[in-house]
Each structure stands twice: as structure tokens, then as C-alpha cells.
From Swiss-Prot:
This is Uncharacterized transporter bll3471. It comes from Bradyrhizobium diazoefficiens (strain JCM 10833 / BCRC 13528 / IAM 13628 / NBRC 14792 / USDA 110). It is a multi-pass membrane protein. Belongs to the AAE transporter (TC 2.A.81) family. Keywords: Cell membrane, Membrane, Repeat, Transmembrane, Transmembrane helix, Transport. It is found in: Cell membrane. PANTHER family: K(+)_H(+) ANTIPORTER SUBUNIT KHTT (PTHR30445), PTHR30445:SF9.
Amino acid sequence: MDTVRWIISTAPEIFLLLAVAIGTMLGRLKIHGFAIGTTACILIVSVLIGQLGTFTFPALLRIVLFSLFVFTIGYKSGPEFFASLSVRTLAQVAMALVLGGTGLVIVLAFAFALKLDPGTASGLAAGALTQSSVIGTASGALAQLGLPKTVLEQQEANIAAGYAVTYVLGYILTLLYVPFAAPKLMGVNLKDEAKKLEVELSGGAPPKTENLSYRKFQARAYRVTAAAGRTVKAIEEDIGSRTVIERIVRQGADIEPRLDTVLEAGDDIVIAGRTAAIVAAKPIIGTEIDADEILKAIPGNVLDVLVDNRNLHGRSIRDVADRIGGDARGVFLRALTRHGREAPLSADTRVYVGDVMTLVGSTRNIERAAKQVGQIVRSGDRTDIAFLAAGIAAGLLAGLVSFKVGGIALTLGGGGGALIAGLLCGWLRSRRPTMGAMPPAAQQTLSDLGLGGFIAAIGLANGHAAWVAIQAHGLLLVGMGLVVTLVPLVVATLFAYHVLRMNPVITCGALAGAMTVDAAVTGACEIAESQTPVLGVAVPYAVGNVVLTVLGPIIVACTFVG
């Protein structure tokens, strides 16, 4: 033990990294398909390791780690958050606000009734509402109150205890509530409602201007006989299904396939579009030919395009196609991805900022259409460190600004400032794609390492006090956590279904998004046997990340007694 104590006093960072490593490995273990999650496991492991001795970490380390995490959260959510400030998505925003507001009211009610200290109340909110970032924002707010060191450490220990006890409970309850309890509360069968929604989304005739096809794309070569003397436009309209003539070869020379170009007998042409339409085009054009060289010369491509045009936010694919019009000629939509999950495709599927469209067609055509949609996702592995560092620095500076609430001087704190900076930087990146690059892999690394390191530092430094608090108030925290998790979910469900008249399938996805529990979306999709719940996730997820994070300073302000 003397050696262990020597390492603790000399190099405590070794145990911090060990806690992150062990907690991450345990968090990935699945039992009957269920995993606790890395954040909770890191905290539990660090609290247990904290029983070995007294760990001391510089405040700067925790500030930097948490700032990296919360800035990245803001960066990822920024485009969706600002785009959600729209009439078209007002219902989903309102639902997320109601859920977060209800959670805040219940936490404060418990705090006043049971005289909970700010740390315990903040930990309860962080765990029961499954939002780890509340730990950081609450800790930052407490640090600004000028508390004695021992008092501040006890408050941080209480945050850790409240979170450790209630997070797993809140996570499990959300996983069970969204796919099972919510549909029963609304009086619907989720599977049947999903089928109805799919029919509704796929209903109606395709619009004339809908050039974004959600069918399989194929290109074939024909030699013109029957189509001689007709224009490209006439042939494309005759074949239908948004088929496009991509190439014309006349006597060995390429002819630009403009809409008014007249085809001649003997021309070799390449048409692209739905497989069924192309196969049926033979009597309209002529004989299909084996022309590998002609087909190889077509610069076909499959590119992902990030939707960042706010004018398209909340609109249907049909509406998006109408707005893009002729610029989408020859471009086909193969997939729509939202938060890493593929959304069901139909003419009425809604598109949101932050979605990724997988487009198929010639490179030229895709690049033309992409200008109207957003930005092509280029493969790259470099992060704009200058942009990242400057953004976090600006956020930390903004966090120093103070204002008074009830005679208490409060600030956004480093966490709140970094969150706002991340939101603005993420939005700015969507407006100016040439600056502020942060590839998804880098975002995930910064987020995981920042939060994991911060949580480990909290658990190690306050391990003994947190363990004492858990032993003293564990059952009480469990009871409060159950209420803080379930009541906001129930209120939000009833509000969305009966007041906002939201589709029950969309409501289930929105509940998971507002609680920022991705796994609950997967559960809803499995019960519904459909991907339609994914359609409700995007906006509440972005709003929920922001709303729940700022609860930390609010709870501290309302419960602190000087």
C-alpha cells in the first residue's frame, strides 16, 4: 500500500487514465443486449479507486477536459440547434422544453421539500435526466460561489453520489419507457402506428419536379433508332421516373446532352435512373448495346452531402426536390442518415439540418445539386486546432461574465461558455465549410476523452466523500431519481400527443432525443419494426443537449443558501 500511496501522491494522473480505461471497457460490456454506458462506469470505477487514498488534481485539468467535451457537444449540435428555431419544428422544440422544464421543477421541489444541498440536487438532475454535462456546469457554478475548500469538495462529492446512484436507473427507465410505456400511455400500438406512418409517408403521386429519386440507380447504353429526331427533354419525359440522358456519343465524338439536343440515328447514349424505367426504355430509344467504354467514361459517384441549408429544415423530400428543381437532374437519393441511423425514405420524409443525404449520380450533377442542399462530406483527418482552441478560449472568456440572481453573483461558467461557443462555432462551420474542420472521429475522441477524464477526476478526488454520501442517502436518491426520470417523460408524452398532436411514432423518437438516450431510439425501432421513430430524434436531441446542460447553474442558483 505504501507504493500505491506514493504513486497517488506523485503521479495521480496514472489512476485517472486507468479509471478511464477500465470504465470504458466495462461500459462496453453488454448483458442481454444492455450496456450501462462508459460515463457511469468511469464514475463508479473512479469512486472505488478513490478509496485508496487522497487524490489531488489541478483545477486547470478539469476545466480543460470538460471544456473539450462540452465544446464538442455544442459543435455537433450547433447547426441543428439554430435550425430548430423554426416554425416548422416548433412542436418538437416545445416538447423538449417541457421535458427539461418539468425535470427542473421536480428537482427543485425535492430540493426545497427535503432541503437538498446544491450538489445533491445537481447530481440528481444529471443522473435522472441522463445528462452528464450537468455535472460540469454545476461544478463550475459552485466554484464561483467562493465556498471554503472543504465545503466545495463535499458539494462535488454530493454531485458524484447523486449522479452515480440515479444515472443507471434513469437510463434503464428511459430505455423501457420510450418503446413500451409511452405507446401504452398514448393508447396506441407502436408497430401499427409505424405502418400507418410509412403508408402516409409513401402516399401520393410523385411531383413532376422531383428529381431526387429514392430508388436504385443504374446506367445503361443504347443505340438510337426509334428516338431519332426527338429532343433529350422529350425522351426523358417519355421514359419518365426522372430518367436522365447522361452522355451522347455521335460518330466517336461527345455531344453535350442539353435538354434541347436532338438525337440522331446511330447515336450511342447512356441513360441513368430507376432500373425498371431504364429496362423498359428499349422501344422508346432503340437497341441496348454492350458499351463498357462509354459507361466507364461516365464519372459516376456516390457522395454524402451534409444538409445545412436552413431553408430546407423540416421540409419533405418532395418539397426539397421542388426547391432544387432542375439542379438535381440526374441525381438520385439512396439514403438519408440521421444521428448515425438510416431514416425511412419516401416523398414525405422530413429533412433536417444535420442529416446526411447519400446521393448517386455523376460527380458533376451531384456537385451541382449539393450547392442547394449543403456541403459534400469530404474524407479528411485533420482538425482545425486553431479554430478549436480559439473557440474554447472565447467561450471560457464569456463564462467569466457575471450577473446577479436573488443577490447571488452567477456566471455562465467555463462549461456554459464553452457550450455556447461550441454552438456558435458549429453553426459557423456549417455556413463556411472551409473553416473549423473537425472530423466526426475527432469529435468523438475529444468528447469521450474530455468527459471521461473529467468524470474520473471528480470521482477520484471525491471518492471517499461520495461513497459516504451514497451509503447515507442511497435509497432516498433512488426514489427521487425514479420520479425525476419518469414524471418529465410522462408529462412530455401527454403534452406532445394531446396538446401538440404529434404522431405517436415521432413522439417516441422525440422523447429519446430530448433525454439524449440514443439506445432508446433503437428500442423504439425494434418494437415498431420500422426506422420511422428516427424521424423524431434530430431537433429534440439538439435542444435537449443545450437545455439539460444549462440546468446545472440554474439549480445551484435556486438551492444555494449563503
